[in-house]
Amino acid sequence: MASTLAMTPVATERTITRKSRTPEPSPGFAGPGHTAVEVLAARARQTDPFVLLMDDRLDFDPGQVLGGEHPHAGLETVTLMLEGGLDGEAEGLLQTGDLEWMTAGKGVIHGENVRAMGRTRLLQLWIALPRALRHMEPQVELIHLASVPVRREPGAEVRVYSGRSGDLI
């Protein structure tokens, strides 16, 4: 997805202003069976363009419908499936290692009929779009694990979902 947006890299120098420990999981918005950890809290001045990073843990019966319709606008959500999966009629099937990159742009309503595939864990990062791109048409890209390039080095394996690592783009 990042390759479809014409964005100029911007170097921003930052200093560490505070350190914190990641909190314990707390009840999530989807009710019993959902816990979440706010890994990166919304502190726009310190974390811009990153709005929020959540570590969501879902323990629902397979096929159970989750959440419901909800809107996003002016941002991108990047969802990495760490364990399990979700099956969304509109979004498609996300399984372990898959990534969904949704650019909400001028606005999108999504999340209807998303079904759990049993125990699931995912990371979701919210990124503020630059002002010039906040009113673009919404788009969604699913990146399935099998299509993600892998860079192997002694003692390390890097999957490149966006950007580059060494010679991999």
Where would I find each of the regions flagged by the language model?
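A short beta-strand-loop-beta hairpin characteristic of the jelly-roll/cupin
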Residues: 76-96, 105, 109
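Short, conserved beta-strand element in jelly-roll/cupin
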Residues: 70-86, 126-131
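"Short basic amphipathic alpha-helical interaction patches in structured regions
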Residues: 91-98, 114-116, 139-142
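Short, structured patches in soluble enzyme cores that scaffold and shape functional sites
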Residues: 124-131, 144, 160-164
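A short glycine-rich, His/Asp/Glu-containing loop-to-beta-strand
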Residues: 26-79, 146-169
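Hydrophobic alpha-helical membrane-insertion signals
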Residues: 2-37
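Ligand-binding loop in jelly-roll beta-barrel domains
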Residues: 105-133
